[in-house]
UniProtKB/Swiss-Prot annotation:
GO terms for molecular function: rRNA binding; translation initiation factor activity. Component of the eukaryotic translation initiation factor 3 (eIF-3) complex. The eIF-3 complex appears to include tif32/eif3a, SPAC25G10.08/eif3b, tif33/eif3c, SPBC4C3.07/eif3f, tif35/eif3g and sum1/eif3i. This set of common subunits may also associate exclusively with either moe1/eif3d and int6/eif3e, or with SPAC821.05/eif3h and SPAC1751.03/eif3m. The eIF-3 complex may also include SPAC3A12.13c/eif3j. Interacts with sad1. Coiled coil: none annotated. This is Probable eukaryotic translation initiation factor 3 subunit J. Component of the eukaryotic translation initiation factor 3 (eIF-3) complex, which is involved in protein synthesis of a specialized repertoire of mRNAs and, together with other initiation factors, stimulates binding of mRNA and methionyl-tRNAi to the 40S ribosome. The eIF-3 complex specifically targets and initiates translation of a subset of mRNAs involved in cell proliferation. Belongs to the eIF-3 subunit J family. Residues 52-73, 219-234 have a biased composition (Low complexity). It holds the Pfam family eIF3_subunit. It comes from Schizosaccharomyces pombe (strain 972 / ATCC 24843) (Fission yeast). Residues 1-110, 207-245 are annotated as: Disordered. It is found in: Cytoplasm.
Length: 274
């Protein structure tokens, strides 16, 4: 038997409810959908992964930027080292060139000092430079003194002869002449050297004849005996040589004249040479 509840009359004041499919879907969509626990865990994991990916990308960007900075800094340091090495090489090359130039200049200065010293010694020997002048200025004064005219050379020749006049008998004079003459002749040409050789050969011949004559006279001349003051004996005595006789004096004067002539010839030859 049916119940009375099945036959209840609806309240006319209450609006009737109708089922609209679209309306239900819209209402259901507006309401939050209930989610299960495993779905929430998956969403959290996805969020974590996305955050990790974002952080990883950020770290990669930062690391790449830092690597770029490090690479640029490294290249800068390499360029600086290359520049420093090139600069050091340039300094070493300059120092080597300066050292080589200083060595050459020092060698040239040493050679010039030796030349100046030799010249100063020669000037001292010939007494050409003023005695009151300082020795440091002697070479400079010698350079300033120029021999141009024949009179200048004649005066220079007179100075030389005056200087060597009293030292011809010394032991070092022979070596001095042998060392000096070749140095004086180095600036002459072959023709002038032959003329000098001719004058020297003539002087050699004259010296040989003079020495030969002196040796013959020395061997033939008898030893001088003193004049006896005792009374002559009855027997015939041996003749004696009177060194004070006119003939002996004449022979001596002739020999002296010969020596003077030879010296004059030598002086004339020397004048012609100069």
């Amino acid at each position: 038997m049916d119940s009375w509840e099945d036959f209840l009359v609806e309240d006319p004041a209450k609006p009737a409810e109708f089922d609209f499919p679209l309306g239900k879907d819209s209402q259901s969509s507006s309401k939050p959908k209930k989610r299960f626990d495993d779905e929430e865990d998956e969403d959290e994991e996805e969020n974590k992964e996305s955050l990790q990916n974002d952080s990883h990308s950020v770290s990669q960007k930062s690391s790449s930027s830092s690597q770029n900075d490090q690479g640029s800094n490294k290249m800068t340091r390499i360029q600086q080292k290359i520049q420093e090495r090139n600069f050091e090489k340039a300094i070493k090359a300059s120092e080597a060139a300066a050292k080589e130039e200083s060595l050459e200049s020092s060698k040239e200065a040493m050679r010039q000092a030796e030349i100046d010293s030799d010249l100063a010694n020669a000037m001292d020997l010939f007494d050409i430079v003023d005695k009151n002048s300082a020795s440091a200025n002697r070479s400079k004064q010698a350079d300033q003194r120029q021999l141009k005219t024949k009179a200048d050379y004649a005066a220079f020749q007179a100075d030389i002869l005056k200087k060597v006049k009293n030292c011809q008998t010394t032991a070092e004079y022979n070596n001095f002449v042998q060392d000096l003459i070749p140095l004086l002749l180095t600036g002459l040409n072959a023709t002038n050297l032959k003329a000098v050789q001719k004058s020297v050969n003539k002087l050699v011949v004259n010296k040989e004849q003079q020495e030969k004559t002196q040796s013959k006279r020395g061997a033939a001349a008898p030893a001088a005996k003193p004049v006896s003051t005792a009374a002559p004996s009855k027997k015939g005595g041996k003749p004696t040589v009177n060194v004070n006789s006119k003939k002996t004096v004449a022979d001596k004067s002739a020999y002296e004249d010969y020596i003077e002539d030879e010296y004059d010839d030598y002086a004339d030859d020397f004048d012609d040479f100069m």
